[in-house]
């Protein structure tokens, strides 16, 4: 989040000025209309006495407010704070976003966090104004709206793809959140959504992956192209118009996803501040995997970052200031598969390619050059025991090392450092990309404390400028 205060007076000033930097950081609701909005909503600013503020969309919905049809507050990326924070609340939010509550319930979420369900409920409600069930419900509602308005998928399929347990639950939630039926939402879709409705299950699910602020797509696609492992990934097309495609192993099945590069992916949003999106298309063997697949892409492309906060801090450093000016909104790429990233951080690209050819699972329906899933840790541990690779994959397979979105970063680092032969520099890379830590500096590198808490981003600026090599 930005360094500006977020007390209610400051929040109201952000609403008055339609400041898009606060979109997702908080939401406001108007008691006289029963509607909640993002701070940059272009509608007439309501009177201060009629406004209530909420930390999350789920909290606003839980208080009986409906999403504004003009600014679509549910579509904005949530606060970047929850991806930065390493405490139980941040870990819980990341797990909920990954669909854990939909798959395993609140008890499963609590078990992953090492707390009781009551403790998790209390902590989330205290900080976010909503518990895990409400947060998961808000996410399902948003996913459903996007699918209803931008695809031609049948309503029944959308209900289950969004994570709902029944069509009735889906219909009731849509009415409660949007004051519309699914059919009415589809009829009211924006023009770009209507244009994309030719999509069918066989053609995949087209989605726009929103980001806040400026986004430097080029360096991200450069990295993905440099690292791409044949059979699992490919990058095609000329710079500025490339497409990244890869296979995914998901909780219910498999997927092939494609994300397009958008040159200068910024646009004028509400107010004077830019925002934008990346176009994606997802082919899933089981539509229930949609939420998880989308979250993995968001982590890979670092779409939930707050570039305003990052750039403001780093631009204050004389060495970094010209780099930030040259590449505003530079991201710190993550990964679509944390365990795969850990193995690839240890091996070279040619070795990873060999592992895929020898141990990767062949897709039932290959698509062009995409033919395999990256081998699972248990398969590698059994096939190539001994050495650092064997020790690492065994630790991953036994869950001695956890790299999922809810993993404790310090615990994971300690467990990785305990793997024989795994050096601290490789562990730092895994912590940065697999665990999404924005503040990592490799050992032995003299990095100023003034770059905290965004040292991972600072190093990406140096790498993009050719002043530092990560490996």
Residue ranges with predicted function:
Residues 1-471:
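HhH-family (HhH-GPD) DNA N-glycosylase catalytic core used in base-excision repair
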């Amino acid at each position: 989040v930005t360094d500006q205060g977020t007390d209610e007076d400051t929040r109201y000033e952000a609403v008055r000025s339609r400041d898009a930097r606060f979109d997702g950081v908080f939401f406001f609701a108007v008691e006289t209309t029963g509607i909640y909005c993002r701070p940059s909503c272009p509608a007439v600013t309501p009177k201060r006495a009629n406004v209530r503020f909420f930390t999350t969309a789920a909290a606003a919905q839980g208080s009986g407010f409906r999403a504004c049809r003009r600014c679509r507050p549910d579509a904005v990326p949530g606060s970047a704070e929850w991806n930065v924070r390493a405490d139980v609340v941040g870990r819980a939010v990341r797990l909920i976003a990954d669909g854990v509550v939909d798959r395993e319930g609140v008890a499963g979420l609590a078990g992953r966090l090492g707390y009781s369900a009551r403790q998790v409920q209390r902590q989330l409600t205290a900080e976010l104004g909503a518990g895990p069930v409400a947060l998961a419900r808000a996410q399902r509602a948003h996913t459903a709206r996007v699918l209803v308005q931008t695809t031609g998928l049948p309503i029944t399929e959308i209900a289950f793809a969004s994570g709902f347990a029944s069509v009735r639950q889906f219909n009731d939630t849509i009415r409660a959140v949007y004051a519309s039926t699914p059919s009415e939402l589809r009829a009211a879709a924006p023009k770009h959504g209507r244009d994309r409705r030719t999509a069918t299950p066989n053609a995949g699910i087209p989605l726009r992956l929103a980001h806040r602020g400026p986004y430097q797509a080029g360096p991200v696609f450069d990295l993905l192209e440099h690292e791409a492992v044949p059979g699992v990934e490919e990058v095609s097309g000329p710079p500025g118009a490339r497409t990244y495609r890869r296979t995914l192993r998901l909780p219910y099945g498999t997927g092939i996803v494609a994300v397009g590069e958008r040159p200068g992916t910024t646009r004028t949003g509400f107010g004077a501040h830019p925002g934008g999106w990346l176009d994606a298309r997802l082919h899933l063997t089981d539509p229930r995997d949609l939420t998880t697949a989308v979250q993995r892409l968001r982590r890979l492309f670092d779409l939930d970052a707050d570039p305003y906060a990052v750039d403001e801090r780093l631009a204050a450093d004389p060495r970094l200031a010209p780099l930030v000016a040259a590449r505003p909104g530079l991201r710190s790429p993550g990964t679509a598969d944390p365990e795969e990233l850990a193995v690839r951080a240890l091996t070279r690209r040619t070795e990873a390619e060999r592992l895929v050819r020898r141990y990767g699972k062949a897709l039932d329906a290959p698509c062009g050059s995409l033919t395999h899933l990256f081998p699972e840790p248990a398969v590698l541990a059994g096939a190539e025991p001994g050495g650092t690779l064997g020790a690492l994959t065994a630790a991953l397979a036994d869950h001695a090392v956890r790299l999922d979105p809810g993993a404790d970063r310090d615990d994971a680092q300690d467990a990785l450092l305990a793997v024989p032969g795994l050096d601290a520099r490789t562990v730092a890379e895994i912590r940065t990309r697999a665990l999404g830590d924005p503040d990592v500096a490799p050992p032995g590198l003299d990095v100023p404390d003034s770059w905290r808490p965004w040292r991972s981003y600072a190093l990406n600026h140096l790498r993009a400028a050719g002043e530092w090599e990560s490996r």
